[in-house]
């Protein structure tokens, strides 16, 4: 945002969907601000919330109180921005990914799309959108680069949360997931296969990067941080690493976008930023 980096489309998965919102509204530092402020609030992300609501992140507090009142999301800026915004969710009945566009975050359906994308299995309630039963998009498609390419976004900036060389191992929670979601065998199968799809996507991403169609931004080092981290020093360290690595890639990003605009004899191809889930 500090360097006026703009793209045609954004797709986010899980926490990437939540962070992507503040990028589209151009509210720099918003996610970091409320994460630090409310990290110990029992309604923000806690066992209290899980026990009392069925969600590790309380729906009312996280998806209404914060964006509507405590640290307002700029709804007008979201609608006014021509950048199209999508989130990735997992369909429990089919096991497949659903890529859903959000056009107005005042619309309860769009709020539920984002909530579904970030609703982790076992510690979240199922979210229903347009008759679909949905959960965290990371299960079915953690890095939705190919979905965006099918939509016509041929040149992509991909933001990963793991350093170079990382590969995901088998799901350690599979037995619990198989029991909890036994009525949804396709979803359980996807949980079982998740690491294979994830690692194959990383392999393909590296090929696209070599071809020049994709620019990858990833952490330059490993920081051992938990998925539900509350320690302020760990959150701050991860944030500062992200800022540092983004600055290191800034000139490459500008050049990548300039080349995109010059493609096809002056007719710009679509450009996009793709964010990976944090899991």
Segments (PLM) and residue ranges:
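Patatin-like phospholipase
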Residues: 1-10, 21-279
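Gly/Ala-rich beta-loop-alpha elbow adjacent to hydrolase catalytic centers
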Residues: 12, 16
């Amino acid at each position: 945002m500090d360097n006026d980096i703009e793209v045609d489309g954004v797709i986010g998965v899980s926490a990437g969907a939540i962070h992507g919102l503040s990028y589209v509204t151009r509210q720099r530092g918003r996610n970091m601000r409320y994460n630090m402020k409310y990290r110990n609030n029992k309604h923000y992300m806690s066992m209290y919330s899980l026990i009392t609501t069925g969600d590790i992140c309380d729906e009312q507090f996280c998806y209404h109180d914060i964006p509507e009142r405590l640290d307002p999301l700029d709804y007008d800026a979201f609608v006014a921005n021509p950048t199209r915004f999508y989130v990735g969710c997992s369909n429990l009945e089919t096991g497949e990914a659903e890529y859903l566009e959000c056009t107005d975050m005042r619309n309860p359906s769009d709020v539920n799309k984002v909530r579904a994308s970030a609703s982790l299995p076992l510690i979240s309630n199922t979210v229903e959108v347009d008759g679909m039963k949905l959960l965290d998009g990371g299960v079915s498609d953690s890095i939705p680069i190919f979905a965006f390419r099918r939509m016509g976004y041929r040149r992509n900036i991909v933001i990963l949360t793991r350093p170079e060389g990382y590969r995901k191992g088998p799901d350690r929670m599979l037995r619990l997931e198989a029991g909890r979601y036994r009525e949804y065998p396709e979803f359980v199968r996807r949980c079982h296969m998740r690491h294979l799809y994830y690692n194959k996507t990383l392999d393909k991403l590296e090929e696209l990067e070599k071809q020049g169609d994709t620019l990858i931004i990833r952490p330059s080092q490993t920081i051992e941080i938990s998925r539900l981290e509350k320690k302020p020093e760990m959150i701050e360290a991860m944030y500062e690493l992200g800022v540092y690595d983004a600055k290191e890639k800034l000139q490459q990003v500008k050049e990548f976008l300039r080349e995109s605009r010059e493609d096809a004899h002056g007719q710009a191809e679509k450009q996009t930023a793709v964010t990976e889930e944090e899991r």
